[in-house]
Structures are given as C-alpha cells and as structure tokens.
C-alpha cells in the first residue's frame, strides 16, 4: 500500500504530494489522479531543458523557454532569431548543433534599439593556423541586432535581460573574417 510522505498545499489551491509506493518514490500534482515515478520526472526535466530550433528563415524565441539551451541545427537559409519582449530575468543559451561549418548566418534581434545589446563576443577563426582571435562589442546605446556569420562547432551565445537591455556573452567559431557584426533596427 502506498504511503503519502509529504503533502504541500499552495496558496492558489494547487498542491503536490510525494508518496512511497512499495519502495518507489512517486509525485502527484494537484488532483492526485496521476502519480509519476521520480526517475520519470528526472527524464522529463532533461527532455525539456533544451529546445531544437526550426530550420527556417525566422524563429521566435519565447519567454516560456527562458533558461533553456536552444540548439540551432545546420540551416538551409539565413535565420533571424527574434528575442521576446524584454523582461527582467529572461536568459537563453544558443549553441550550434551542425556536423560541419554552417553555410548560413544567424541574426539575433531584440526588436527595438531601446533594447540594445551590452557585452561582447569573441571569435576564433580556425583557418589561419588557428591564431586569429577577435573580440567584438556593440555600441552600447542602440545596437539591437547581432549577426553571426557561418558558425561552426563550438559556437555558443548567451543572453541575459535586465528588463530593458540584453547582456550578451559568446564564443563564435567561424572561418569567415569579421564573423560578428552589430546593427540598429
């Protein structure tokens, strides 16, 4: 027989319970009609900790996916990735998930020059004996677009929003000279 170990009732009427069902820890949310084993919850958490973006000319990043890694596949066309409306606490990580250097470009767009980028990106260019490293910075007052040209394996970009502006930190691997550019709307 299952034994309820914990029960927590939230202020809005939502509740969850934890029980021991013959040595298996299970969790139930709200009504308690569906019990989920602890190992299933761990698998679910892993499955939802990342998003694979679509191979399309545009991709809308949602606030609901804040905190998740977005895997960008080898694209068949340049892609504009539109960040959500600025809100404090939003954060995203984007990584390149292709098997070879992408022939396409990424553009991250905040949607407004008032929601400009702060921070910087480093580019490593592997085709000149691997000795080309350049750091890029936005202008700090209006650059609301970041273009990343032909990313390769190891490329990642992180964004953190303070409610108005987007802080960016990134490492771009690309054999394209000047593979990072900034622009206004």
Language model feature labels by segment:
Residues 2-3, 35, 165-167:
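Tryptophan-centered short beta-strand motifs
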Residues 39-133, 160-185:
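Exposed extracellular interaction/assembly regions and N-terminal maturation sites
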Residues 131-155:
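Structured beta-strand segments within beta-sheet-rich domains
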